[in-house]
Amino acid sequence: MLLELNQNPLTPHSSASSVREQALFHLLLGELMAARWRQGRHDIEVLKSEVDRSGYDIVLEANGVLRHVQLKSSFSGSAVRHVTVSTRLLEKPSGCVIWLEVDQRTLAFERYFWFGGEPGERLPDLGSKVSRHTRGDSSGQKPERPMHRDLGKACFAPLGGADELLIKLFG
């Protein structure tokens, strides 16, 4: 059994998911800052939420635009077809969701997806599909999460990389 766990490439993604999440966060910031640098622009600010309560992971500001960003990720080629988005993000100015498809082995970004409005606009409607908890209760039922919506991949715009993402974020 132990040998099987060591050979399963998904095991570290389960047992060290918070490490993976932080790595992806820092890799994304590095890519955005490097892309900004190549543009000759050095005016990006980054604020990280310490409490996961308001629907966003980070706040980015550049070009006078403030963005509350919820980050999502999945593996390239995975069967994931939707992500869960907090309705609290609707309350934030220029809220948006960035969904990254990453290489399972290297964590390299392979595809970027965007859901959000123009700079200065609020987050578009999240639809009415209420999310459910991923784990069932003692009776096996998966209760609803009334403050969250399932947002399908079809709602997201595919982007070509960090440069296109910066345009979506800040114009």
Predicted regions and their residues:
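Mixed-charge (Asp/Glu-Lys/Arg
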Residues: 1-54, 59-171
